[in-house]
């Protein structure tokens, strides 16, 4: 036994491999442990290759239903199902230089909060397009109740297979919507076609650090929980798709930190919502469970934002006038 231990200790990583490993940033102690585990027989490549990431635990999709729609608004505000309430929408939309003379489309309209605030604040005529039938129906009902069914209607639209919009617009806004679309080039080309000359298109969206991020267990969990299968790309790929569609990029900025601040601010008041619901007794248990599911949903998103695997970026794209 003692002889076996002595032989085990004699197994060392050759010096020429040590030097190469130090230069390339590998852990020599880890390499030595692997070499001993293999009885001293292994190639340099075998000793330095990355261990496969553990498989991600399966996560159920968090689909939209009446209860989730209700709970989301308790967290994010009436008409909103994610970060960025009226003040944020107005502030970010100043890049669009909106006026009552303009018409605009909102891609990924959600419950219609952003569309309605733009119509009310700037007098713009809005068409909102949402890929979730349940969100679109609820959003249209809210527009009707606000007396904005004509100025800010919300329509259900299959963004994956869209071929045309029913009219042309002066402005466009896509708020965290493109990451759910696989055929981005097609959608962006259709948007470009239905924007008038010298129009602006404002986009905020989730983008990944690089394509390897898709293999990260935490990213895979995030992908599996989304109600619509996500197809995120890198920021460079997003810019390339916009330019391919015919747009010129005026703004390209990482707003992840600001986005995380908005998430934290909204959830800071969630404990008050939980306290109020708790006082209602057993009949509030479904709502409380829904809030916990929503918290887990957003925790998975924020986790990969903080690690840098996922980012939120803002783009302002311009459709130049055609010289005739």
Place the predicted regions along the sequence by residue.
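Conserved class I S-adenosyl-L-methionine
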Residues: 101-110
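Conserved alpha-helix/loop element of class I SAM-dependent methyltransferases that forms part
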Residues: 82-100
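Class I SAM-dependent methyltransferase SAM/SAH-binding core
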Residues: 105, 114-161
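Conserved Class I S-adenosyl-L-methionine
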Residues: 8-16, 30, 251-324
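Short, glycine-/aromatic-enriched active-site segment of Class I SAM-dependent methyltransferases
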Residues: 206-229
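A short acidic, Gly/Pro-enriched loop at the edge of an enzyme's catalytic core
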Residues: 163-172
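N-terminal auxiliary segments of SAM/dcSAM-dependent transferases
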Residues: 2-61
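A short glycine-rich, Lys/Arg-flanked "PGG" loop and its adjoining helix->strand segment in the class I
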Residues: 185-200
């Amino acid at each position: 036994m003692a002889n076996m231990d002595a032989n085990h200790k004699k197994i060392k990583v050759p010096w020429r491999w040590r030097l190469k490993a130090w230069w390339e940033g590998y852990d020599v102690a880890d390499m030595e442990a692997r070499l001993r585990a293999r009885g001293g027989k292994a190639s340099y490549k075998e000793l330095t290759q990355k261990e496969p990431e553990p498989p991600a635990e399966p996560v159920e999709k968090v689909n939209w239903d009446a209860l989730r729609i209700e709970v989301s608004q308790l967290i994010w505000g009436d008409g909103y199902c994610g970060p960025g309430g009226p003040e944020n929408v107005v502030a970010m939309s100043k890049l669009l230089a909106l006026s009552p003379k303009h018409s605009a489309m909102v891609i990924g309209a959600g419950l219609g909060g952003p569309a309605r605030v733009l119509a009310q604040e700037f007098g713009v005529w809005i068409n909102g397009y949402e890929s979730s039938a349940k969100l679109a129906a609820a959003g249209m009902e809210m527009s009707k109740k606000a007396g904005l069914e004509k100025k800010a209607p919300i329509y259900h639209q299959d963004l994956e297979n869209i071929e045309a919009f029913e009219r042309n617009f002066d402005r466009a806004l896509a708020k965290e919507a493109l990451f759910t679309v696989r055929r981005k080039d097609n959608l962006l080309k259709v948007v470009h076609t239905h924007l008038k000359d010298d129009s602006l298109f404002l986009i905020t969206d989730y983008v990944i650090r690089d394509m390897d991020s898709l293999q990260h267990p935490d990213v895979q969990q995030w992908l599996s929980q989304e109600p619509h299968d996500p197809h995120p790309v890198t920021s460079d790929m997003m810019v390339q798709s916009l330019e391919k569609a015919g747009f010129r990029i005026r703004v390209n900025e990482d707003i992840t930190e600001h986005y995380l601040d908005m998430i934290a601010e909204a959830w800071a008041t969630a404990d008050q919502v939980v306290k109020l619901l708790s006082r209602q007794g057993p009949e509030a248990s479904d709502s409380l469970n829904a809030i916990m599911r929503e918290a887990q949903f957003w925790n998975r998103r924020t986790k990969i934002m903080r690690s840098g695997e996922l980012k939120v970026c803002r783009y302002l794209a311009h459709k130049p006038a055609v010289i005739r």
